[in-house]
Amino acid sequence: MKRSIEDTSIVFIGAGNLATNLAKTLYYKGFRIVQIYSRTEESARTLAQVVEAAYTTDLSSVATDAQLYIVSLKDAAFVQLLPEIVAGKEDALWVHTAGSIPMDVWVGKVNRYGVFYPMQTFSKQR
């Protein structure tokens, strides 16, 4: 059975420059962004409003039923929070955007994973 992009639910862990640009692009292309997590409410809420998603500042409240989780955090925060981020969501598809973190950071933590690292910088305004 072929799945349409509208059926793919995506959660963003992070709401910085890269997450903002990627979430907006995916949303405008028809993907369903279901939730945004950020440690700051303003960042989470601002991006969530644009992509018509729920938001949270509590990692334990991140949706557990999404098909794709895109982790776009600062590298050090990603490594520190990784066990908490993936708990209960090990069978989803996970990607991170951390340039200095290898893909094998996922090994033994989740079943499906990858790295999405654009070769350019982003700002929220562009």
Where are each of the predicted segments found?
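NAD(P)+-binding Rossmann beta1-loop-alpha1 motif at the extreme N-terminus of oxidoreductases
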Residues: 1-54
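Proline-centered loop/turn at the N-terminus of a beta-strand
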Residues: 54, 92-93, 112
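Short, well-ordered alpha-helical microsegments
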Residues: 44, 78-79, 102-104
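Short, conserved loop/helix-junction motifs that constitute active-site signature segments
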Residues: 85-91, 107-110
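Conserved SAM/SAH-binding loop
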Residues: 57-60, 118-119
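Rossmann-like NAD(P)-binding element
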Residues: 59-86
